[in-house]
Design a protein with these regions (language model features):
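Active-site acidic catalytic loop and adjacent metal/ATP-binding pocket
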Residues: 151, 365-416
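Conserved ATP-binding subdomain of kinase catalytic cores across diverse folds
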Residues: 123-306
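Residue-level detector of functionally pivotal "anchor" positions at catalytic/ligand-binding pockets or at interdomain
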Residues: 577-604
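C-terminal catalytic region of ATP-dependent kinase domains
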Residues: 396-505, 554, 558-580
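ATP-dependent phospho-/nucleotidyl transfer catalytic cores
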Residues: 165, 180, 243-381, 454
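Tryptophan-rich substrate-binding surfaces of secreted polymer-degrading and adhesive proteins
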Residues: 497-564, 570
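C-terminal tail/sorting-segment detector
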Residues: 11, 617-631
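Regulatory N- and C-terminal appendages and interdomain linkers associated
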Residues: 27-137, 477-507, 553-582
């Protein structure tokens, strides 16, 4: 049997080596835990009364929030209790710790909000306990046993009015957040890694809103961002989550009463919008706010429907208040902007008949080409197979020119909906929804140039992405990953595929696009191959009506993901005809731009007062930018 001293040293070494608890060897920090009556007990008193003592029976001390708090060696006066603060500003935690109480489980519905309490400790001396409303979050993922959830902090009456505002790191102020489970993803944060990489990709571009003619200083990202978080439910370990920014107007730098600031989310594609017919139930107008439906009722994004305009009964109602009248007029404007967007593809098809030059000129009046090219390159690099129909955001700042940005990146880096990875050599079909039809036809050169530019700058490189991957993995740490695996052993990324008798997995991905789908009425003979649920299956004997698999999954690892990046870039170098070492596409030199330097930025888009060692992005008054390497 191991000695108490050996076990203690082993535990501490594991914690330190994985950056699990950052401050154990520095000054002690305090927090708070609660008894069954939710009465605050100062953690310093609890720790003093029950000193940490690892034994064989309590080695899983981190399984409970109480054990976590006790383990962190808390002392009086070392923690800032922010529970009573209306506004909280804090650096982004490397790893946060959250305990939800007042509910028995994570909700299963996005429509029903539950009242709960949240305790948060940032691992660096800050703590709070606040009321919040919690509901399920996500689409397909809502059926997984480990679910995403959304929280909105509320006042003492459980209302969303006068709610506390949080400023975390460089994020915009928010009063609510998403907590992403990433159940099929072994990193429990692959999507967050993708967003961070995308921000590096577009760091040399002007902000989206300025490209749309709206000039208002903001820290908005126009895509989510997140940091790792350990979540407990009623004191018991629930899992590793990502604490993430919501799709909120502040993160889009939009005003809720400005009709031209339109943000669409959902099934925005040829089937429901771009081909001239609008299915209003398939997507949500997230901004502006205070909209009204064609029936004169307040617009509800959970149940989207057609917006009101002058042709609708009830648009003119003498009993409407000034606020309602304003909302209806705003709705009519937004509706016209969306209808106009719906007709763009037909208009552009007509211009296409007049020639490429005319088509490009008209396309660039209607869409931000930079965002389309960046999205296309990003789509191909990360193999974002779920980002061509609904998991993207479409938005405009003037009601005329639209742009696109990614959202929901859980199926990237080869990871599929079912959790098994696809090889980096696997190809994706071309995006054809909306304006991408014309991007694929007429902007192949510009797309290849953008890819080459990003490769030359080092943004699309192993050196740029691997530190982001390793940073996330290190912030969570191997011990928490082991706990996650014990808590959710059926997670697809932890399990090998299980085939029914007569079938086996086929790994020849080169034939995927030419292989027919599984047909339950067909008789398959040994060697016959079919596609089902994103994977190839090969019959090992004569079978009819036998489903190929019991469990469609595969074990995934950090090593697989790291190797995938290198191989994927090699594949795309060949696809785009890029040769490492070729000259990058040049931005205008300082003497060819008009105006003074607008600002200096880091590679991930943060403004800095002066150039730093390494890569700097210098922007000029006319919108041009240069990448400068400072020795």
């Amino acid at each position: 049997m191991k000695s108490h001293k050996d076990m203690t040293m082993k535990r501490h070494f594991c914690i330190w080596s994985t950056a699990l608890l950052l401050s154990l060897t520095a000054t002690a920090q305090t927090g708070a835990v609660y008894d069954s009556d939710t009465t605050a007990i100062a953690a310093r008193r609890y720790a003093a009364a029950t000193p940490w003592d690892i034994t064989d029976t309590d080695k899983d001390v981190f399984d409970t929030f109480e054990g976590l708090v006790r383990t962190m060696g808390l002392e009086e006066g070392k923690t800032a209790d922010l529970s009573d603060e209306a506004e909280i500003a804090m650096p982004e935690p490397r790893l946060a710790y959250v305990n939800l109480t007042g509910i028995t489980d994570i909700p299963t519905s996005k429509q029903r909000q539950l009242q709960a309490w949240m305790e948060m400790y940032d691992g660096e001396g800050r703590y709070f306990r606040k009321r919040l409303l919690v509901k399920a979050q996500g689409g397909y993922s809502i059926r997984f046993p480990k679910r995403n959830f959304s929280v909105i902090f509320c006042n003492e009456n459980w209302e969303e009015e006068d709610t506390p505002d949080f400023s975390i790191g460089d994020w915009v102020r928010q009063d609510g957040f998403h907590f992403k489970a990433f159940y099929t993803d072994f990193m429990r944060g692959t999507g967050e890694i993708g967003y961070k990489w995308y921000r590096q990709m577009v760091a040399d571009r002007l902000p989206f809103w300025e490209r749309g003619g709206y000039y208002n200083e903001s820290r908005a990202l126009c895509v989510p961002d997140g940091f790792p978080c350990i979540v407990y439910l009623n004191g018991k370990f629930l899992g590793v989550y990502a604490w993430q920014l919501k799709k909120h107007r502040r993160n889009m730098n939009m005003k809720k009463a400005t009709a031209e600031h339109v943000h669409l989310d959902g099934n925005v594609n040829d089937l429901y919008l771009f081909n001239g017919k609008v299915n209003w139930k398939q997507f949500e107008a997230r901004n502006p706010k205070q909209l009204y439906t064609s029936k004169g009722e307040p617009y509800d994004g959970n149940y989207p429907s057609e917006l009101i305009d002058e042709k609708c009964k009830g648009f003119y109602n003498a009993e409407d208040s000034a606020e309602v009248r304003e909302g209806k007029e705003r709705s009519a404007k937004v509706k016209q902007y969306i209808l106009r967007l719906s007709g763009y593809k037909k208009e552009l098809a007509a211009f296409e008949r007049e020639g490429e030059e005319t088509l490009k000129r008209e396309l660039e009046k209607r869409f931000d080409i930079q965002s389309l090219l960046d999205y296309q390159v990003f789509f191909r690099v990360l193999m974002n197979g779920d980002g061509t129909l609904k998991n993207w955001q479409w938005f405009t700042y003037d009601g005329v020119k639209w742009m696109v940005a990614p959202y929901d990146l859980d199926q990237t880096f080869g990871i599929t909906l079912y959790g098994f990875p696809r090889p980096a050599t696997h190809t994706l079909s071309t995006i054809t929804s909306g304006p991408f039809t014309f991007i694929s036809r007429y902007y192949a050169r510009e797309e290849a140039e953008r890819y080459a530019e990003l490769r030359q700058k080092g943004v699309l490189s192993e050196e740029a992405i691997l530190p982001v991957i390793h940073d996330w993995y290190g912030r969570v740490g191997t011990e928490w990953y082991e706990m996650e695996k014990r808590r959710w052993p059926e997670s697809p990324c932890y399990c090998e595929a299980v085939c029914n008798d007569g079938w086996k997995v086929c790994d020849d991905w080169s034939i995927y696009n030419s292989t027919p789908n599984y047909d339950e009425y067909r008789t398959y003979r040994a060697g016959d191959i079919c596609v089902l649920d994103g994977r190839l299956w090969e019959a090992t004997k004569r079978v009819t009506g036998v489903f190929p698999y019991v469990r469609n999954s595969d074990i995934d690892t950090l090593e697989r993901m790291v190797a995938w990046i290198s191989e994927r870039l090699n594949v795309l170098d060949e696809y785009y005809g890029y040769e490492p070492g070729q000259m990058a596409v040049q931005r205008p030199a300082p003497d060819t731009v008009s105006g003074k330097e607008e600002g200096i930025y880091t590679i991930d888009g943060k403004r800095i007062p002066q150039r730093r060692k390494g890569i700097n992005i210098v922007r000029y008054g006319n919108g041009a930018s240069r990448v400068i390497y400072q020795k």
